[in-house]
């Protein structure tokens, strides 16, 4: 019954809503694809192509130090958001996109990132502007639930104990992160079964036990991610870059395949043109999280002298995630012969490609890399979750711990569930989060744009 409900909501959000007949090409788009493309295009135009104009400012904002000691630094917030993107998004998300949508899905992931960077800027700037003191953990907390609450108070003209839209966003976020917890264990157990022939149940239980030791500690923080994430991402980037450089003669053919399938000029392995577009954008959202309201939960925790700088940091995170690391994963798979990867999906597909490039070491490398990424992902999503738990239940150690236990249970469940069911729950949660987040982004976006103009005016005076 529960699985049927999840699949029903999934079809409502991600199933075909609009079908366009363009000559010999049929393009079927879902509600979420239309929503994200529209929002991304709108905010990209309103910010006047921010990812291009202010790229140097993004790099400068990441390097700023936190001298006050409270809250996170700009770099730490980038690390937290990268922890949830790199691994689940860059490995599992890209694999899922190519498995179902073919090579053309990669192009639409790039489009999602370029448009999503501006969306991420707006939501993260607002999160920083409307952050609140975190009396339980110290520092700051915030995110869409908090600026949705502010918007509701303005419309009502009075103080509110809670906002319906804010509560719905918070609940959707908790559902989504439970789904991601399942994706973590499902992917790791599958990878370890392929690499070491370890039964999924054993891998899942060990992963859950190790995760419990980390996340159930009262003083567990994101400081461990400061070292883990940069090293993991760096090693993965270097390894995949080496594979790409050793296959340079094949690279033009890969680009031809990506663009021809993306634009409907060649039939994709995973289905028609609409399937290519939808899966690329859907997995692009799962990877870079732009517009979903996840990253603002980290952005709000930063100690920052200008909300715009935090918006720039998170916009950069979207570009790093999808344009750089996701592309590396995609090229590794697409540089392998189709005869090697044909008929495979999930981590089986990526491991087969890595085995082709690096032999048995490639299978082990991906399994170990994914396991390490999964720890950082799990810590990252629980960091996101705690501000939403706090909005729903206040400053309560009981409810914070209860959600951590629930997430650990989802790790166990995910290791035993079917691949598609696990993804559907995550897609339902992230879809609902995006809808509720957009309810605030459009009416409040003017404040982020005003802050951007003031930031640029200050730059001219210096």
Where are these regions (language model features)?
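Transmembrane helix-loop junctions in multi-pass membrane proteins
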Residues: 46-51, 90-94, 176-189, 211-224, ...
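Extracellular/periplasmic helix-exit of transmembrane alpha-helices
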Residues: 123-135, 241-257, 270-271, 301-304, ...
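Alpha-helical membrane segments and immediately flanking helix-loop junctions
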Residues: 68-100, 126-129, 136-151, 164, ...
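Membrane-interface loop-to-helix entry segments
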Residues: 35, 39, 43-59, 165, ...
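Flexible loop linkers connecting adjacent transmembrane helices
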Residues: 49-74, 96, 102-105, 118-159, ...
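Helix-loop-helix module between adjacent transmembrane segments
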Residues: 39-44, 82, 115-140, 149-186, ...
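N-terminal alpha-helical transmembrane segments of multi-pass membrane transport
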Residues: 1-88, 98-105, 116, 440-462
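Selective recognition of specific alpha-helical transmembrane segments in multi-pass small-molecule
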Residues: 115-123, 203-218, 229-249, 282-285, ...
């Amino acid at each position: 019954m529960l699985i049927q409900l999840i699949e029903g909501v999934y079809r409502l959000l991600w199933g075909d809503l609009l079908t366009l007949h363009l000559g010999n090409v049929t393009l079927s788009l879902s509600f979420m694809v239309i929503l994200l493309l529209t929002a991304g295009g709108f905010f990209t135009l309103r910010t006047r192509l921010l990812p291009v104009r202010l790229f140097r400012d993004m790099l400068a904002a990441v390097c700023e130090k936190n001298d006050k000691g409270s809250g996170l630094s700009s770099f730490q917030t980038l690390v937290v958001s990268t922890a949830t993107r790199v691994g689940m998004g860059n490995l599992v998300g890209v694999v899922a996109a190519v498995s179902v949508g073919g090579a053309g899905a990669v192009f639409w992931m790039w489009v999602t990132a370029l448009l999503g960077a501006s969306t991420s800027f707006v939501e993260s700037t607002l999160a920083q502007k409307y952050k609140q003191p975190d009396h339980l953990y110290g520092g700051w907390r915030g995110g869409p639930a908090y600026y949705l609450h502010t918007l509701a108070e303005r419309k009502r003209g009075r103080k509110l104990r809670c906002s319906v839209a804010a509560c719905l966003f918070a609940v959707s976020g908790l559902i989504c992160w439970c789904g991601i917890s399942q994706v973590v264990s499902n992917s790791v157990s599958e990878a370890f079964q392929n690499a070491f022939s370890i039964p999924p149940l054993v891998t899942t239980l060990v992963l859950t036990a190790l995760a419990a030791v980390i996340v159930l500690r009262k003083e567990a923080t994101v400081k461990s991610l400061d070292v883990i994430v940069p090293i993991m991402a760096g090693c993965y980037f270097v390894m995949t870059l080496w594979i790409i450089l050793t296959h340079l003669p094949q690279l033009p053919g890969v680009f031809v395949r990506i663009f021809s399938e993306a634009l409907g000029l060649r039939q994709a392995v995973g289905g028609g043109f609409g399937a290519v577009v939808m899966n690329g954008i859907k997995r692009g959202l799962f990877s870079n999280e732009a517009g979903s309201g996840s990253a603002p939960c980290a952005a709000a925790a930063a100690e920052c002298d200008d909300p715009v700088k935090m918006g720039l940091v998170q916009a950069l995170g979207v570009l790093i995630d999808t344009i750089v690391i996701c592309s590396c994963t995609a090229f590794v798979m697409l540089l392998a012969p189709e005869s090697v990867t044909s008929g495979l999906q999930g981590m089986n597909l990526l491991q087969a490609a890595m085995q082709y490039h690096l032999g048995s070491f490639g299978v082990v490398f991906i399994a170990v890399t994914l396991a390490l990424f999964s720890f950082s992902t799990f810590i990252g999503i629980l960091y996101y979750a705690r501000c939403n738990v706090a909005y729903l239940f206040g400053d309560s150690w009981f409810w914070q711990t209860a959600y951590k236990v629930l997430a650990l249970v989802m790790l166990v469940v995910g290791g035993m569930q079917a691949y598609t069911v696990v993804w559907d729950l995550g897609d339902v949660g992230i879809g609902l989060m995006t809808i509720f987040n957009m309810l605030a982004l459009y009416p409040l976006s003017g404040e982020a744009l005003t802050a951007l103009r003031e930031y640029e005016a200050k730059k001219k005076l210096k």
